[in-house]
Amino acid sequence: MVHHYSMSCPDLEAIEQVEWEFSRQLSRRRLEQELGSREAAADLSELSEGEKDGKPDTHPPPAAAAAEAAADDGGGGDHQQQQQQPPPHQLSRFARINSDPRIVSDEEEEVTTDRNLYIVLISIHGLVRGENMELGRDSDTGGQVKYVVELARALAATPGVHRVDLLTRQISCPDVDWTYGEPVEMLTVPAADADDEDGGGGSSGGAYIVRLPCGPRDKYLPKESLWPHIPEFVDRALAHVTNVARALGEQLSPPPPSDGAGAAAQAVWPYVIHGHYADAAEVAALLASALNVPMVMTGHSLGRNKLEQLLKLGRMPRAEIQGTYKIARRIEAEETGLDAADMVVTSTKQEIEEQWGLYDGFDLKVERKLRVRRRRGVSCLGRYMPRMVVIPPGMDFSYVDTQDLAADGAGGAGDAADLQLLINPNKAKKPLPPIWSEVLRFFTNPHKPMILALSRPDPKKNVTTLLKAYGESRHLRELANLTLILGNRDDIEEMSGGAATVLTAVLKLIDRYDLYGQVAYPKHHKQTDVPHIYRLAAKTKGVFINPALVEPFGLTIIEAAAYGLPVVATKNGGPVDILKVLSNGLLVDPHDAAAITAALLSLLADKSRWSECRRSGLRNIHRFSWPHHCRLYLSHVAASCDHPAPHQLLRVPPSPSSSSAAAAAAGGGGAAASSEPLSDSLRDLSLRISVDAASPDLSAGDSAAAILDALRRRRSTDRPAASSAARAIGFAPGRRQSLLVVAIDCYGDDGKPNVEQLKKVVELAMSAGDGDDAGGRGYVLSTGMTIPEAVDALRACGADPAGFDALICSSGAEICYPWKGEQLAADEEYAGHVAFRWPGDHVRSAVPRLGKADGAQEADLAVDAAACSVHCHAYAAKDASKVKKVDWIRQALRMRGFRCNLVYTRACTRLNVVPLSASRPRALRYLSIQWGIDLSKVAVLVGEKGDTDRERLLPGLHRTVILPGMVAAGSEELLRDEDGFTTEDVVAMDSPNIVTLADGQDIAAAAADLLKAI
């Protein structure tokens, strides 16, 4: 607080400039949000004639009433029924995979146990393991790690749940323990599975941590550096989930004998995919979109809230905040999660109203109107808001010793005796937890009540304000000791910047107020020590305090209550709702040191109040048990993810095995092995091991390699003999072992296809793809052009469209297969896939109105009817300076409840608006799933510039080859504003999967050499 007096005038002026800029931006943003909210609310308030007559076109499903009741109780909205559905014949072939609406709620008396649900949880950053969690080691390894691990265990123990996978990043780094490099860690195996002796698949159940590599494998990256590697994680997660789903299907629902030996089992796809924090929310959104399964997200802490706090402090300009925290990238990931989420789990109503309300993709007033229309069964006019539900976090009470708890804090002889044993040299009479002596050695008088604070050393945890409150209150110092458990440390100078700053400030404050002998700050503790620390505080009749500036969950408050500790907690975030339930403490303003002091004194000095808070916490703590949490969670998922469309799993065509692949898997067993199914033992083990098939250095041994080979045999396909006529083989799914994707956007300045450049690209691709395995390689054209435009462009180049396995057109809105014949119809199954949440004609008129820049004329952005299709609204843009950028238009549409992808193509002369699930990268993943092609066997050719979605084509598990000099004009200038994130936050250009060919290099030869790798 003294720093401002030493600042120079330029420094003060800079701070004032930051504060003014923040105020201006905040006011402008809130005005835009209010305009969007009013417009959406006005449209939704209007009822059509049919709706006024009470004759809606659709009806809510049976679970709607329960969902609405739960939404009202939880402060969130209900899931809106989707109005834009594909034709019935499309739905019957490719319907969205939906959660079973019959899963029981928390209030029902009986629980059915024959569901065999598969649930996927995702938490990428930090150090995640099941035992000896290093909580507090760094800012990325905190309460979220403990929460997701315990959630995985608890869900796996819930009746009806067969398997839970917790996906996280694999870290093979000498700076961290070797366990973080293990591909799979088993968390639990249900007792019923352990007793299963028939080998029918019981061993596949339980909870597992599955670690997938992404980014540099020898580095432990902070979460701010993980963003460019998200696509690689998604691709590996997609492969893992697909393999597990198919193997589970073979075990749990094998085809009946009447279907024949070659029949494929029905895959057991995830019941829900749940992303935790912004990075995992983006992964979950992309994964759920690719698999067409429900998606749930939990924010844990939110980027917009953090941005506002940082800007209010006025110490960092927005550009510095972006560079340090990658905050714009984080916010966009959270918005992406809101676009795709069926449900958002929150810890408090305050989080819904004050934190999620800051986002473009959620407006409480609009959501409520959509909920009303849902109840009436009327159209939501293409608008969507995710359902927000409040589910209090759970806690594992298995570590709580009820006998000790009955004695702790009672003030009897037992408490005094335990403490006396630690002070008396003769301690052999009773073994006590070692952490007790480690803490009490700091105190001159260890008999005093203990104020306990337990958190990682993070500025947001606000420990320095607590120390100031303690140091400045003589009465508080005389009455109690203070214990600070701030993670683990060896040398402060070797710690990360934020943690080192906090710990240094703590030591300085202890010295300033001369608190030696009154404050404990041990360097190390184990996770198993934490219960003993709570018990010690309770024995001294102490108080637990959480003074965080904002606390999303407040798990430590629940833990403290479970051990009989009254609490003082921040009034910002989760503690508000927790204390409403537990009634075991007081809320304070974390910025007010005097209020913190008064609250602590109130509980420590008034023993009757202390006892009342203790009893109340113990009496109500069952409301936060994991079984209660999981039952409530599953009932909310069932209500939120219920859709009226027919339910049918994603079609995965069976693939015949080749004799060569089978022989390799069987160790040279010959052709006879090709038709043999996986043995039970291999099938069981395959569900427990997730190894990168393209990375032998990650192999878990010969057995793992054999399992991977067996899995590969199950989904591999016939390898045609190499010959000059190899391409004459049918293009049916399963015929290709690799794909070469031409995604170079060859346009002139006028937006027309540059035939000369496109011809070079096509000839290069075809010549590079020739080789010994030419018959096993397929070709795909991926473009922003329509299907007729793409076909005409290929023919103008002298290329036969039928030489391509697939054409991805209209920026991913359509896929067609030219080898099927002259009728180049779009893939109806893919159309059904992308139709989910498509606003259709409701958004068509909104885009030109919102997309034109100030002063632009109506003709500057007008509907291009010839380029439109069922799932693509195309608009002709006359002048790039007269239209707004993609990010701005998407933001405006989100504020009005419309969920779309937008792409400027054809050198900024056309804007394609396509469904949320449609894009060129997502269409490629769709083909890889449908055709059973490993993404590591895919190569994508791109130019140095291109459409605004070009940067999304680069990253992933596939090989990307950037060809110079092939594109005359791109559209990237209309992607985002300068104050947003950059391409470096989307794609790691130094990835070994991305190769940029140099000018003057023999491109054809170099490309051919690169393609040999796939």
UniProtKB/Swiss-Prot annotation:
Residue ranges, annotated region (Disordered): 29-108, 648-677
Tissue specificity note: Expressed in germinating seeds.
Induction, per UniProt: Circadian-regulated, with the highest expression 1 hour after the beginning of dark period (in 14 hours light/10 hours dark cycle).
Pfam family, one: Glycos_transf_1
Activity control: Activity is regulated by phosphorylation and moderated by concentration of metabolites and light.
Organism: Oryza sativa subsp. japonica
Gene label: SPS5
Family per record: Belongs to the glycosyltransferase 1 family.
Annotated catalysed reactions: beta-D-fructose 6-phosphate + UDP-alpha-D-glucose = sucrose 6(F)-phosphate + UDP + H(+)
SUBUNIT field: Homodimer or homotetramer.
Family matches, as PANTHER family: SUCROSE-PHOSPHATE SYNTHASE 3-RELATED, SUCROSE-PHOSPHATE SYNTHASE 4
NCBIfam families, sorted: sucrsPsyn_pln
Protein name as annotated: Probable sucrose-phosphate synthase 5
GO BP terms in the entry: sucrose biosynthetic process
EC number: 2.4.1.14
